[in-house]
Regions:
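Active-site regions of metal-assisted phosphoester/phosphodiester hydrolases
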Residues: 1-2, 6-19, 66-217
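Short, acidic/turn-prone active-site loops that include or flank metal/cofactor-
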Residues: 50-58
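N-terminal, active-site-proximal structural segment of metallo-dependent hydrolase catalytic domains
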Residues: 1-46, 58-63
Length: 217
């Protein structure tokens, strides 16, 4: 599951945000634009560093860009192109090893020049990680919808889809309407599992993003 909680702008709804996260019952939950005041009861959690060193005036001391919460033990962490914006852990699951790459592609949205740079760097990470032979799950804020004209750049969309196709990765949330937070998983990890997709925060009251979860059966 993944959700961008909008830098906890709506911290008066912290209890509801925590409840929404818990209700997913996700074995792997990636939060983006997140905050250490969101404390979830998982045996393992991994976080990009606080952002106050980058821009102390702009960010709260409790803010970070990506957090991964999981019920699975971590074998090791992998280096990414930008340790503040992308986080990769290798987990031991009941279906074998899985690399989870939690990310924000383009922290200022897809219209800012940094989006393309971020996209190129992160797709390079994904190519290198795919070459390791371990199945991959890319999960987070892609700043790109795929099923409609909600929010996307043509180049960004095509580049992501081409890379996923080249590396046998399925974008499971591709057909979700007005959805820019996504979950993409190596086809060999999905195998012949049934897929069920659920969303929450459709009214955007708790943050300006919907949350999305994928359940394998």
């Amino acid at each position: 599951a993944t959700w961008n909680i909008e830098r906890l702008r709506h911290k008066k709804f912290l209890e509801q945000i925590l409840f929404a996260c818990e209700q997913t019952q996700a074995d792997i939950l990636v939060l983006t634009e997140t905050d250490h005041r969101v404390r979830l009861d998982y045996p393992y959690s991994f976080h990009t560093p606080p952002l106050t060193d980058l821009q102390p005036v702009f960010y709260n001391p409790t803010e970070n860009r990506v957090s991964i919460y999981t019920n699975y033990p971590c074998v090791r962490q992998h280096k990414t192109c930008d340790g503040c914006t992308a986080l990769c852990v290798e987990l031991e699951t009941e279906k074998g090893r899985l690399l989870v790459y939690g990310t924000i592609i383009g922290i200022y949205g897809n219209r800012h020049p940094s989006f393309q740079q971020s996209l190129v760097q992160q797709l390079n990470d994904i190519k290198q990680l795919s070459d390791s032979g371990i199945p991959l799950c890319i999960c987070g804020d892609f700043n790109c919808s795929f099923s409609d004209g909600y929010y996307f750049t043509k180049q960004g969309r095509e580049t992501l889809l081409r890379t996923f196709s080249d590396y046998d990765i399925e974008l499971l949330t591709k057909n979700e309407a007005k959805c820019i937070d996504h979950i993409a998983v190596s086809k060999r990890f999905i195998s012949n599992s049934g897929i069920q997709i659920t969303e929450w925060n459709q009214d955007k009251l708790l943050s300006d993003h919907k949350g999305v979860a994928v359940c394998f059966s």
